[in-house]
Amino acid sequence: LHPSNIHDNAYAIGAIDFTGDMPVILGPDGPSLGGFVCPAVVVNAELWKLGQLRPGDTVRFHRLSLAQAGEREAAVEAALSSLAGALPATPSDDADAHTTPVIYEDPAREDVPAMVVRQAGDRYVLLEFGPLVLDIELRLRVHVLMTALKDLQAQGQLPGIIDMTPGIRSLQVHFDPALIARDALLKVLIATEAALPPVDDMVVPSRTVHLPLSWDDPQTKLAIEKYMQSVRPDAPWCPSNIEFIRRINGLDSIHEVFKIVFEAPYLVLGLGDVYLGAPVATPLDPRQRLVTTKYNPARTWTPENAVGIGGAYLCVYGMEGPGGYQFVGRTLQMWNRWRHGEAGSVFEQPWLLRFFDQIRFYPVSQDELLRIRADFPHGGYALRTEEGSFSLKDYRRFLADNAASIAAFKATQQVAFEAERERWAAAGLAEVASEADVEAAGPDSEIDLPEGGRLIATSVPGNVWKVAVSEGQQVQAGDVLMVIESMKMEFNLLAPASATVHKLMCAQGGSVAAGQNVLVLIDEAV
């Protein structure tokens, strides 16, 4: 329902990522890929500035050309090598630079999908295939291309490639411009893609990995409660994400949601979707593809290994952090911090899953899951896996044989989706608080202060977790006035001196911006 949602693709370091109405800049500790649109990327030479930012700072973006980015990189490297003085000034804004991110387009021809290549900052290019739809054939084409490029790397014919990350219908190539120029890389990509064999008869290895799932786990319920208390109490997906999934998909009961989740084989299309080997997967059978919108605004906290659905995709969160997928439960670890490298074990690498694995869930109680989670990283729980393969020819036959029932399911689903949209509009839930609403009480707003009045502002953006005082109350220096929750941390807002609380300017559970005025104190001496 939100225009920021896209089919998951890779994220560049420095990408400006619009997660619903909340933009963030992704650093080197950010996710490998995700399902939100990224309209721009901070160039490599300017990434150091992200580490200098603090709550309350204002960020202004300047548009640079690729040539300017290269010049800036050279100037910064020279300054660091000599340490002779301050870093050179940032190049001036180039209004004509990169009016479009598209650097190459190849239209569809016969059985070959269209390809678009986009610039992503100065060190990445993103190749996208076909229309904006979920199509497993497009993912297979991405796989064939990545395999061909890796072969060129192994033969020493493609220097300067740092990494490649596949998405649902895309491949992001991270390169070092000191070793291979963007235009030279583009020529290799175009030639390699043009020479790809057809995927018609493609068969890829596909294990079935059986994972325990604690349905509607208490930790996911806690995350929903925290969200309702501190972010958005009236969100349509609260208080039950599972009920929301049922409603928006036109299912008759929560048991139908349960049945689909536990019967569907989920094909892993990407890894690192929200950190640490986390899979993004979708059911092979379109009749089992539950579709949801994501949280807006996003959650500030998600339990490790929570299982959720966003768009048509399922994700297992690799670690605690923000998130937006609708919860169905919780499973075991996707990433092993303690034990890996054993040949033949499920953790030959730190990450558990592989591309094109098929996940099958089986139900366990919350207590069983806690025991499994305690034992699994240390080799104390045997995970059941079965070797197999995925054949595109067989899959096409399955889709053709079931075309009528698939179309009927999608039609019912679409009717329910539109009905949900209308409910939101009727209830006034289609829009959340705008930036203007937050800025209304910002540092530049006009407020009539009484004599001796003092404005108290929060230095961090977040949500008002607790209002500890009331109007007219006497406070002493150091008393807690409010508790602000920001990115999983709680910040106490303290009284600077003995005073009386004159006016509260925000409510418990509301959102606040860095620098926003939240209450007025009258100093005791007045």
Where are the regions that the model predicts?
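Conserved "landmark" site that anchors the functional core of diverse proteins
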Residues: 1-440
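A generic structural motif
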Residues: 17, 331, 468, 485-490, ...
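Short histidine-centered loop motifs in beta-beta connectors
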Residues: 46, 51, 345-346, 465-474, ...
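Short, flexible surface segments
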Residues: 55, 303, 355, 471, ...
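Short hydrophobic beta/alpha edge segments that flank linear recognition/processing sites
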Residues: 56, 473-494, 513-526
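Generic structural signal for buried aliphatic residues
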Residues: 59-60, 307, 359-360, 464, ...
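Short beta-turn/strand-loop junction motif enriched in small, turn-promoting residues
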Residues: 312-316, 470, 489
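Acidic, low-complexity mobile loops and tails
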Residues: 438-482, 492, 498
